[in-house]
Amino acid sequence: MSGTTGERPFSDIITSVRYWVIHSITIPALFIAGWLFVSTGLAYDAFGTPRPNEYFTPARQEVPIVKNRFEAKKQVEQFIGK
């Protein structure tokens, strides 16, 4: 026995003016917020990743690859200079 869930059909939602008024503002706002998050460098600070100019320092020009998983902590500390 099938019934109805009481929800509006999707076709009614996407053809309503209210849907497009709300989404014509929120979708571009999300893109702009994401662009600002990355372009200001806040994404690097929030996630702790190095900025593009910090991958290779003047003292270390090789790629920092961990070669022994059992001594990974020591190797990472050598890479960052601790």
Swiss-Prot record:
Cofactors, names only: heme b
Binding-site residues for heme, renumbered to this chain: H23
Gene Ontology CC terms, in alphabetical order: photosystem II reaction center; plasma membrane-derived thylakoid membrane
Note on cofactor: With its partner (PsbF) binds heme. PSII binds additional chlorophylls, carotenoids and specific lipids.
Coiled coil: none
Keyword Transmembrane applies: yes
Lipid bilayer topology: Single-pass membrane protein
Subcellular localization: Cellular thylakoid membrane
Keyword Transmembrane on entry: yes
Main location: membrane
Single Gene Ontology BP annotation: photosynthetic electron transport chain
GO molecular function, one term: electron transfer activity
Swiss-Prot/TrEMBL keywords: Electron transport, Heme, Iron, Membrane, Metal-binding, Photosynthesis, Photosystem II, Thylakoid, Transmembrane, Transmembrane helix, Transport
Pfam families: Cytochrom_B559, Cytochrom_B559a
Subunit structure: Heterodimer of an alpha subunit and a beta subunit. PSII is composed of 1 copy each of membrane proteins PsbA, PsbB, PsbC, PsbD, PsbE, PsbF, PsbH, PsbI, PsbJ, PsbK, PsbL, PsbM, PsbT, PsbX, PsbY, PsbZ, Psb30/Ycf12, peripheral proteins PsbO, CyanoQ (PsbQ), PsbU, PsbV and a large number of cofactors. It forms dimeric complexes.
Protein's job: This b-type cytochrome is tightly associated with the reaction center of photosystem II (PSII). PSII is a light-driven water:plastoquinone oxidoreductase that uses light energy to abstract electrons from H(2)O, generating O(2) and a proton gradient subsequently used for ATP formation. It consists of a core antenna complex that captures photons, and an electron transfer chain that converts photonic excitation into a charge separation.
Family statement drawn from the similarity comment of this UniProt entry: Belongs to the PsbE/PsbF family.
UniProt-recorded name of the protein: Cytochrome b559 subunit alpha
Species of origin: Nostoc punctiforme (strain ATCC 29133 / PCC 73102)
